[in-house]
């Protein structure tokens, strides 16, 4: 396994994202937990604040194809594909590629990209309905750390099982007390937020062989509101 940012081409805000204890409250987290319209297309403090396709994933598709040697003959799975934006762009790049997605949100599936809606399956992230070693690449962005520790372990084991060894996951993490505090202020769905060294132990436990990247306060450019 290696630490590697397969999302390096994804646009990041240049200005800090200011967070604090009274911006995203328990009411916002309750709303987000339903993963319905409020989370995807409602108020920004409840989730995305409008989750619309804008083509920003196209650059990610190109870089991932180079990073992982993906071609039209590859098989790809995205765990937690939401509205299928990344899958859609892969489908446009390689129309004959075997593409599959899983999602737990009925709203996201109902409002997913028409081009890939037929290949999105509703299922738990801990029980993927696929054969062993079925996919050349398995992707899970913003998924694993929204689960309990037990389910995060099960999800990683499933990613390892259905893939052929190549995968990419993001993990909610911190390196110090400040980072932990800022990430807690920011996250709506984060359930397992660990120190980077603790995540390494989890990955070793499941025999993970793919790539991982830490979603942290530094990565997100979070800053604390003062005064």
Show where each model-derived region lies:
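A conserved beta-strand element that flanks and buttresses the S-adenosyl-L-methionine
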Residues: 139
């Amino acid at each position: 396994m290696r630490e590697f940012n397969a999302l390096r081409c994804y646009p990041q805000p240049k200005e800090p994202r200011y967070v604090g204890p009274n911006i995203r409250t328990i009411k916002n987290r309750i709303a987000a937990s339903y993963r319905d319209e409020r989370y995807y297309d409602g108020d920004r403090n409840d989730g995305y604040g409008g989750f619309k396709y804008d083509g920003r994933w196209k650059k990610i598709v190109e870089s991932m194809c180079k990073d992982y040697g993906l071609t039209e003959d590859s098989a790809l799975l995205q765990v937690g594909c939401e509205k299928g934006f990344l899958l859609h762009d892969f489908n446009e790049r390689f129309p004959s590629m075997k593409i599959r997605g899983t999602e737990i949100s009925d709203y996201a599936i109902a409002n997913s990209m028409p081009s890939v809606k037929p290949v999105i399956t509703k299922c738990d992230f801990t029980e993927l309905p696929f054969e062993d070693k079925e996919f050349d690449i398995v992707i899970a962005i913003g998924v694993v750390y929204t689960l309990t520790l037990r389910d995060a372990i099960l999800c990683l084991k499933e990613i390892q099982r259905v893939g052929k060894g190549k995968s990419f996951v993001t993990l909610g993490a911190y390196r110090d007390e400040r980072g932990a505090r800022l990430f807690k202020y920011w996250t709506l769905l984060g359930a397992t937020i660990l120190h980077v060294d603790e995540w390494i132990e989890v990955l070793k436990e499941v025999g993970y062989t793919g790539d991982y990247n830490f979603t942290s306060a530094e990565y997100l450019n979070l800053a604390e509101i003062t005064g």
